[in-house]
């Protein structure tokens, strides 16, 4: 554990941006395609999936980046001022400033939604996608399923206590403005212009983000090279040993595939 803490603290770098908060990241130099990990909502770059992928890329000699969004983890900025649009720009900053050549994006939950946006915005850079419990449109869809009275109350208070099992409070506090801004980034109502290989991993016991969202993404993207992998006992975080093994093997297969294209 001490070594792990040392590793996490020792090599944090910061991407300085003149007009936006600085982003904390860890970068491993290596061959292409590189791998970039996008964490979930209220998560950070030190999660088990991120570090497992880093170790794997290190063993293979491939480039790897994990980072924190604005207002999350070690990055600058205030979480309560963040939006999906700002986090989308964070992902593009990382791709533009920190990577060279083709990249495989691995997006967890909300990171899966952002990875889809990045693939649309940077088609020349994003060579493949791996989603874990992709949460495309999920916050907006969940909000719109609330009774009208509840929606109005949230609008008046300006705050939505989004239920979660992943912290002590059992909710994430999101502003009403966050939800209205997020509506601009919804993508499941029309074809998604992404043509690269896509792998979508989802646990069928996911109590946070329904696995059917991964099926919708698979249906909407223009890419023909799409696999959906459902784990019958998988939870939302997909961080059991077998889940991690599946994730690493999926990335490994894509690296091989891209090498032969």
PLM-predicted stretches and their roles:
Residues 234-246:
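Catalytic histidine-centered segment of alpha/beta-hydrolase-like enzymes
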């Amino acid at each position: 554990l001490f070594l792990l803490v040392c590793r996490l603290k020792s090599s944090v770098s910061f991407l300085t941006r003149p007009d936006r908060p600085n982003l904390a990241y860890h970068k491993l130099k290596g061959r292409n395609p590189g791998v970039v990990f996008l964490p979930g909502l209220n998560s950070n770059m030190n999660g088990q999936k991120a570090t497992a992928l880093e170790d794997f890329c290190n063993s293979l000699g491939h480039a790897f980046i994990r980072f924190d969004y604005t207002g999350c983890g070690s990055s600058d900025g205030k979480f309560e001022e963040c939006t999906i649009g700002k986090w989308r720009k964070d992902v593009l900053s990382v791709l533009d400033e920190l990577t060279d050549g083709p990249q495989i994006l691995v997006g967890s939950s909300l990171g899966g939604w952002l990875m889809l946006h990045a693939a649309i915005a940077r088609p020349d850079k994003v060579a493949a996608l791996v989603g874990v419990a992709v949460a495309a449109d999920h916050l907006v869809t969940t909000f719109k399923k609330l009774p009208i009275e509840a929606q109005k109350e949230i609008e008046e208070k300006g705050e939505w206590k989004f239920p979660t099992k992943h912290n002590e409070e059992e909710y994430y506090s999101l502003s009403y403005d966050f939800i209205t801004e997020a509506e601009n980034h919804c993508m499941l109502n029309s074809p998604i212009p992404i043509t690269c290989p896509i792998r979508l991993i989802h646990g069928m016991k996911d109590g946070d983000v329904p696995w059917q969202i991964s099926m919708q993404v698979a249906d909407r993207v223009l890419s023909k090279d799409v696999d959906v992998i459902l784990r019958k006992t998988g939870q939302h975080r997909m961080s059991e040993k077998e889940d991690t093994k599946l994730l690493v093997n999926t990335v490994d297969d894509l690296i091989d595939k891209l090498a032969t294209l």
